[in-house]
C-alpha cells in the first residue's frame, strides 16, 4: 500500500508540473509550447500505462522492510543535501558546480550510495532564502529519501528520476513550512539558441559517456556538468543551468533509449520543457531533474507510440498488397 501511495504521489507531482507549464504557456500566449506540453502530458500517461505492468509486480512483491542499508541510504542523501547547500551558498560555488562536484566525489568514493548522494545534492541547490532554516532542508531530505527508497523499482532507467524526487521533497517541504516557491519572468528569447545548443551538447555527451565508454550515469552527468560550468565564463549562467538539466536527460539508460537519434529527440524535448518551466518553481531543488524526467518519460512514450503507428501502417500496407 505504501509503495502504491508513493507511485500515485509521483504521478500527481508530474501532472502538477505539466499543468503549471500549461497555465504559464496560456498566460504567455505561447501556442507552440502549449502544444508541446499537451502532447508531453498525453505521452506521459501513455508511458505510465506501459510501465504499469512492472509497477504492479513491485506492489504485489515483498514489502520494503527497514534495514540498516536503507538508513545508510537516507543518511547519504541527507549528507549530500547539506554538503551541496554549504558549497553552494557558504563557499559561493553556485548550484551546478557544487552539485556536480559532490556527484563526482560520491561516484568515485561512495559508489554504493552515489545515486542517493547525487539526489541529495539537487536538494542542496535550493534557494537559501526559501530554505533558510536547516530543519527545512532536513524535512526535504526525509521526504525525498523516503521516495528514493520506495520508488527504487519504479521508472527504472529514466533520466532525471533523482532530481524529480528531490523536487517532490523540496516542493512539499516549502509548502509545509509556509515558504512558497517563486515565479519569475520567462526566459528571454535572445537566449533560446544558446540554451538549445548547450542542452543538445550536454545531453548527447552524457549519453555518449554511458553508451560508448560504459561510464556510470552519475559520473557521466556530474562530469559533463562540471566541465561546462568550469569552461563557461559564468558558472551560474542560465545556459550552464540548462546544460546541467540536459545531463540528467542523458542519464537515461541505453536500454531505454537505444540510438543517438532518439537521444537527440529527448534532448530537444528537454530544452523545450526547460523553456516552458523556466519561470516556475524558482528556488526549488531538483527542478532541473524533474524537467528531464518528464522529458525522458513522455519522450519515450512518444517514441513508443510512433513505433506502434508505423507497425500498424506497415501491416495495413502489407494487407493491401496481398489483396
Residue ranges and their predicted role:
Residues 55-64, 181-189:
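Flexible interhelical linker loops that connect adjacent transmembrane helices
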Residues 1-45, 65-100, 104-178, 187-199, ...:
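C-terminal transmembrane helix-loop-helix hairpin of multi-pass membrane proteins
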Residues 43-55:
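Membrane-water interface of transmembrane alpha-helices
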Amino acid at each position: 500500500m505504501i509503495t502504491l501511495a508513493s507511485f500515485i504521489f509521483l504521478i500527481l507531482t508530474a501532472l502538477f508540473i505539466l499543468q503549471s507549464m500549461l497555465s504559464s504557456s496560456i498566460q504567455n500566449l505561447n501556442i507552440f509550447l502549449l502544444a508541446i506540453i499537451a502532447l508531453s502530458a498525453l505521452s506521459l500517461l501513455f508511458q505510465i500505462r506501459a510501465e504499469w505492468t512492472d509497477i504492479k509486480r513491485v506492489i504485489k512483491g515483498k514489502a520494503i522492510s527497514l534495514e540498516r542499508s536503507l538508513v545508510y541510504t537516507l543518511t547519504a542523501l541527507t549528507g549530500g543535501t547539506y554538503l551541496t547547500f554549504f558549497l553552494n551558498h557558504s563557499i559561493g560555488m553556485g548550484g551546478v558546480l557544487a552539485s556536480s562536484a559532490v556527484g563526482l566525489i560520491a561516484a568515485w568514493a561512495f559508489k554504493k550510495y552515489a545515486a542517493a548522494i547525487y539526489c541529495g545534492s539537487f536538494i542542496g541547490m535550493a534557494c537559501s532564502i526559501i530554505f533558510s532554516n536547516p530543519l527545512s532542508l532536513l524535512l526535504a531530505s526525509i521526504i525525498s529519501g523516503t521516495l528514493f527508497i520506495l520508488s527504487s523499482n519504479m521508472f527504472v532507467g529514466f533520466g532525471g528520476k533523482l532530481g524529480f524526487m528531490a523536487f517532490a521533497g523540496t516542493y512539499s517541504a516549502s509548502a509545509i513550512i509556509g515558504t512558497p516557491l517563486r515565479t519569475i519572468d520567462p526566459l528571454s528569447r535572445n537566449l533560446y539558441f544558446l540554451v538549445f545548443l548547450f542542452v543538445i551538447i550536454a545531453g548527447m555527451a552524457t549519453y555518449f559517456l554511458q553508451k560508448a565508454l560504459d561510464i556510470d550515469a552519475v559520473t557521466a552527468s556530474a562530469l559533463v556538468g562540471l566541465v561546462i560550468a568550469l569552461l563557461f565564463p559564468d558558472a551560474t549562467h542560465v545556459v550552464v543551468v540548462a546544460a546541467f538539466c540536459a545531463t540528467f536527460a542523458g542519464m537515461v539508460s541505453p536500454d531505454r533509449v537505444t540510438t543517438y537519434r532518439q537521444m537527440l529527440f529527448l534532448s530537444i524535448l528537454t530544452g523545450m520543457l526547460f523553456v516552458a518551466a523556466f519561470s516556475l518553481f524558482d528556488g526549488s531543488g531538483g527542478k532541473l531533474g524533474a524537467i528531464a524526467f518528464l522529458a525522458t518519460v513522455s519522450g519515450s512514450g512518444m517514441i513508443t507510440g510512433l513505433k506502434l503507428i508505423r507497425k500498424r501502417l506497415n501491416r495495413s500496407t502489407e494487407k493491401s498488397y496481398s489483396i
